[in-house]
């Protein structure tokens, strides 16, 4: 299991600015949290999705590929950082 954080710099009000994902050994998302500029958060796992937050249907791409796109930066994070964000999103829900 690995954890990744992707920041997205943009001017869209209704789009997330930060994504944190838990990835399985096959590269597919197990859980995801996304945060918005206004402080809102949403989350998804195998049993819960929203209209705006769901697990990807394809394996997570290499970090270099993500960070190579304008406005995006990706980095590996530790489990503790992901779990803090996951817990925060659960409280907001």
Language model region names:
Residues 1-15:
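Short, extreme N-terminal segment that most often corresponds to the first beta-strand
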Residues 15-24:
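Broad, structure-driven detector of short, well-ordered beta-strand segments within folded domains
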Residues 23-68:
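Acidic, aromatic-enriched beta-alpha/helix-loop junctions
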């Amino acid at each position: 299991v690995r954890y990744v954080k992707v920041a997205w710099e943009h001017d869209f009000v209704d789009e997330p600015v930060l994504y944190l994902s838990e990835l399985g050994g096959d590269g597919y998302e197990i859980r995801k949290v996304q945060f918005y500029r206004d402080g809102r958060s949403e989350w998804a796992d195998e049993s819960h999705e929203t209209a705006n937050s769901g697990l990807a249907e394809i394996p997570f791409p290499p970090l270099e590929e993500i960070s190579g796109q304008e406005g995006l930066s990706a980095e590996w994070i530790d489990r503790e950082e992901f779990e803090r964000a996951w817990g925060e999103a659960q409280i907001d829900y």
